[in-house]
A protein has these predicted regions:
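Short beta-strand/loop motif that positions the catalytic acidic residue
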Residues: 179-181, 186-188, 192
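Catalytic histidine neighborhood in serine/cysteine hydrolases
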Residues: 201-222
Length: 248
């Protein structure tokens, strides 16, 4: 379920010369690497990016760069056990890592109504968990290639094995998404063989308005940005007054 990469590149080597390394302290005492680029304006929003179950922090640099260029702040996180971070990844641990990212921004005076949660694949489970809490209402939630639950994914991958009782990290987004009152965007590729699009569609149907979706015919799991996803994300952000309508 988790495939940590120990690589720990620096922002400048990934095309982000003004982005700084910071460390997020979790409630169980871990200090985790993140990359932080403050918003150009003090009143602009900041996007927290929760990545998927593999790779390292630097592999998401190209994806966050356009958001920085619009003037948004970006906090690109890395999970415990990834990118040479201490700890071992698990469901409760990743939730703690996500809370640490929110706390980091709140301590900088960035209010929750200026925080955008962005989850990629596994990271969607963390984004949904955090946004579903009654005490936290982010500006928006963006879910890239999400799933209904880790249990459903395991059952799909191993249909002949009773895995539902064997999966301990469950990430039950299907039991939480209806609690989110913030604007939600879900997008997915029809050719996704890692998390089939049906899971993203089911999750979208379970959410409440305001919600938006787009599904890309020729995209798989990792190439959504190569098939026009960015433009539609920018349109969503513009409609919710989180960037200018021109995306600049």
């Amino acid at each position: 379920m988790y495939f940590p990469n120990s690589k720990r590149p620096i922002p400048a080597s990934c095309g982000l010369p003004k982005t700084k390394e910071v460390f997020l302290t979790t409630d169980d005492g871990l200090n985790l690497l993140a990359w932080y680029q403050p918003a150009k304006n003090k009143n602009s929003s900041t996007l927290i990016y929760f990545h998927g179950n593999a790779g390292d922090i630097g592999m998401r640099a190209k994806k966050i760069k356009p958001y920085i260029e619009t003037g948004l702040g970006v906090l690109l996180t890395s999970w415990r056990g990834f990118s040479k971070n201490p700890g071992k990844p698990c469901e409760s641990g990743l939730y703690s890592d996500g809370r640490a990212a929110i706390d980091f921004l709140l301590q900088k005076g960035i209010s929750e109504d200026r925080i955008i949660l962005y989850g990629e694949s596994l990271g969607t489970g963390v984004a949904v968990e955090l946004a579903s809490k009654p005490y936290f209402s982010p500006a928006a939630v963006i879910l890239e290639a999400p799933f209904t639950s880790a249990v459903d994914i395991a059952s799909w991958r191993f249909p002949l094995i009773p895995v539902r009782h064997l999966v301990f990290d469950r990430f039950l987004s299907n039991k939480k998404i209806f609690k989110i009152g913030s604007p939600v965007l879900i997008f997915h590729g029809y050719l996704d063989k890692t998390i089939p699009i049906t899971f993203g569609q089911q999750l979208f149907n379970l959410g409440k308005t305001p919600k938006t979706s787009f599904f890309i015919k020729n995209a798989g799991h990792n190439d959504l940005y190569e098939h026009g996803a960015l433009n539609q994300i920018m349109e969503f952000l513009g409609k919710n007054n989180l960037i200018s309508k021109s995306g600049k």
